[in-house]
Swiss-Prot record:
GO CC, alphabetical: axoneme; motile cilium
Record organism: Chlamydomonas reinhardtii
Annotated protein name in UniProt: Cilia- and flagella-associated protein 61
Region listing for Disordered, in residue ranges: 282-362
The UniProt record lists the keyword Cytoplasm: yes
Cell location: Cytoplasm, Cytoskeleton, Flagellum axoneme
Subunit: Identified in a spoke-associated complex containing CFAP61, CFAP91 and CFAP251; the complex is associated with the radial spokes in the axoneme. The complex associates with Calmodulin; the association is calcium sensitive.
Superkingdom assignment: Eukaryota
Ranges of compositional bias, category Gly residues: 296-311, 335-345
A Pfam family this chain is assigned to: CFAP61_dimer
Swiss-Prot/TrEMBL GO biological process terms: cilium movement; cilium organization
Predominant localisation class: cytoplasm
Amino acid sequence: MSNITARQTLTRDVQSVDALVRQACKAEANATLLLGTGLLNLTAVDDKDTVVGYLSLDDVSCTRLGSGGPGADTWVQQAAASRFKLGSTAFVRVCATAHLSEIEASAALLRTAFLHMPSLQTLLMVAGGELSFTEPGLAAVFSRVGAHKESGAVLYEAGRDAVVPPLAIRPARVEDHDDMLPILQRCEVAFPALAKLPEASRPHEPFALTRVVAGQDERNRVLVAEAEGRLVGFIVMTSDVDTGSLAETFDLHAYDNFLPPEVYEQQYEAARDSVRGQKLAMLRHQRQQEKEAEGEGAGEAGGQGGNGGVSAGMQTDPEQGEDGEGAAEGEGEGAGEGAGEGGAAAPGTGADKADDSEEAEAQLLAAAEPTDEETRAEMLAMFAGQAPPADPTLFAVTMLCMDPAFEAQAIEFLTPAFAAYTDKLYCVVTLPHDSREPALMGTMTRVAPNPGSLFPEVLFMFHRHALIPDFAVRLGEPGDLDAVASLVAGMPNADDIVASFSGAAAAGSAAVALCQGELVGLVTVNPEVDLELLQANFGLSNHVDLGYQPREQHGEIDMYTMNPIFVHRHRTLVAATMRLLGKTALYYALPPGQQPPDMLEVLEQVAPRHRTASDKQLQAEFALYVFTRQAAFKRRRSVNSQIVVVGASECGLAVVERLLLDPELQFNYLTLLAPGGIKVGGMACQFTAGVIARLGLEARVMLLDAEVIGLDRGSKLLDLSDGSQIFYNQLVLAAGLQDQSRYRFAEADPEVAGLLVTELELAADFSMNDAMVMNSILVYGNAMGAYHSLAVLEAKGAGEKTRFVAPPGQQPPLVGVLHALAGEAGVALPSPEPRDLAGLSVVQPVGPELHASATLIDPADPGPREELPVDLVVGCEPPSVSRSLFTCLNDASLVFDGRLVVDGAFRTNDPAIYAGGSLAKLSRRYGGTHLEHYNSRDVGSRLASSLVSFFNAGPDEPQPAATAAAPPPALHRARAVGCSLPGGNYFVYAGCPAALQRPSTAAPEGGYEMKTASERGLTRITLDGEGRVHSLMYLGRVAVNAPRLGSLVGLHANYLNSLAPKYQAGDIKCLLSFITEPWSELLYNESFPELRETLLEVALAELSAGGREVDGGMVEWVTHAQDAVLEFARAHAAELPGYTMPSAART
């Protein structure tokens, strides 16, 4: 009998599922529709991946497909009402199995359904008759609970225990050793961190496991699990936990620092009082200093004026002695009489002073009130390193070993574990960052570390009350306001949450989660969604199918909160909310700088579109996440490895983007080192400021403004320029090549560093006000960035104040192409003066604008030296490797041969260190090619894919050998470069890697060249000998999108609407206009390469199958290709507004 397993249904299963359902149920299922609307869809496959079963669950009452007669639907609603609880009950909408595999397929489907949804307790199914004879696999677990005579419908029920028999768990005995040992040995490979025997058991000696079992006491416990008459797992626990180190490393205040609540409150109040006292003393000291300063000022004023006022009257001349005192007394009597006659002014003044004093004291007390962050920091300072005053409220799991077939049931250990520790509230597990997560971690809460923590492990927590199975979801009501206010009390945005819930509850767009009747979570939804805005900025078609999901089925999450104890119920709450509100997709928009909600990890991030509409009204400045019916219970596997990406270059950003958007893995510890911040810009940049905002880096990536100054490969530790350190498990070097002028001159005179900027810094920060106050600006270097800098300075009004110099012989090849095109187009370009910048030093300013002096030398006559006063120097030399980074890498013994050498998987000679972008080159085994000639985003994406493949190995599979030879990377996308030019022109050069290695205006050998000159500018396209686009050049007054034009490079000319024949016939007057006509929009779509690969695969399959007619034409392929293109256009209709769909293809 073949091995049958069940998994979530994939899009590629749709045709096979529809055929199976048609055969088994004699009905049409429309699996595509069910994928978007069902609660959970599972497919059973045999060991040949043949579909042999399909199960679709729903959370509304329904009859099973192919069952039930007239009146059955109404009867089901009534009969199942008392048994159905949203969040823990589901209906079987479709269950179809191959006849010969019914028992095995049914068992696999039902078991997977319950294990996939931990909250699911009961399945209900309405069949058209008895199951016993027709479907014995279902009959074995479903019990009949009702029937409807008129329709012939029968209601069946299956509980979790009937499908997934609970494990028999008991304390371990010494004689269990022989059964426990094989499980331990298997887990030493799959999960070594949880299969590590304690040192006290002498793990290197025989029978160490026996000693662990024999050493049980009230603090150390061992439990074993049995199923089907055999031992299938064991767990080792201890209540001897160092909570002090955990409190110093992790934010545990939501869990009372694992102390009894009354002890935590005492410590909290003590710390609060301490902070209040310190702040009050400081504020009073400041107030006293201010009073003294005011008094000194008043005294000076009294000495200068004719009337000393009150303070002058109180002063006594020391020479007066007793006479002076008597005089004062006499004056006082007279004054008293006058005051009496004048009314009650004196007493009133005293009262006012008292009131002012009380008010000032109240203001001091209010200002001294500690914040929660200050109190927590003080708690750490006061109690760190001290023994806890009471037993902590937790126990720790130190070992967990399970048979793979029962690993998903490991959570069943927790109930007897808490029973063994009756006084404990929390169970914790720590895992090294590079360890895989077993299934149990999916039900636990990952605790956030404190900023700057170097603790080498990840902490997971589970609360005793999270085991309560009574969890339900219903619509929110106005009467829930008090419970909501209690739930969110103490949160910074508590008032906003309450206000949002109040409005949403009144409108019927709020849902609440209840545990034993107590409100533990809530969500409010905005039923209106701007789909046009979302489609214009994000790849929405990868997550939802608007053809099947109309506008009213989309909503946006406004507010969300859940008691930390129940965070493992996020999916249940959101999925139930969707059903209650009739939605198939819920979105969450996260603006930059906003704290992400806890439930973000159950949402899927929607990829930002890099090529968006130019309409500013359709520009989104937020990251978008989505929760769909199709992916409601699709869990991405967590990766806790600390991945550090060095450099916010296009390659580095592409690595981060690919990891964030991976559909199968969730990377929880990403760090990006971006010295000076993330700087993007330029017409050829593939990451605009809008794309960065839509990536939402702040939500899931730690951004550090620091450079690497030290690398310890042995400890996997980086020293940073800000004095901090950071550990890594995988390090990605993507700093790229940079202009080194700043570093070279700053070594001689550190003060000049502030005068040197790069072209990106100039474009981002230089203003017209700067142009007005500066008198002399030097652009140094002849890289392409120099011309962009000149254009920026010209546009800001500083063109006349700019001098352009460069060392002779420094012209890069692409600049030569630029000048050649400019000559053809009749465009005058500035040429640099041949000068060397011999020195740059800060001088004492004669005027406010003079900052430094630049020493220029003419290489043809090096004797005379010109001293040029400069206010700003723009470094535009050909980029090279940072000297400090090179020193760091060289000291770490990484192989460097002009560039950092990598293999086909982008690994350096250290398998934990990867490199890409212009910093790296392939090893000689792969031709030694410099990666700077390739598309940086493509390189970064491929590098990230190499990381993903490393983490994708299964728990029983060894991860890919670090020394294994990887195939060469498949890099095909063109690289586009370009810049704005002085005079209002623009230049673009896009080419394949071969074209970038040897840039030229001519076609390659055996190729073909096309050129047009029009009022829009000069456009040149070259084809190689195979008819593919080799390079594309443009110089003119149109600000074209360089990466967009680059997407045409590598395509055969046949894709370009018969480009070559039309050009030869003289029908094309302007190449730029022709390749940007509406017909070309499909070619520019970011998903078009995937469509092209699909078409090529189908064509190759047809050829391999001998699918040819007598005249050599492809059989059926053309029809399949047309269908694929129409389906692509339908799914991406919002991104292709210029395309009109045939009526037959719209559904």
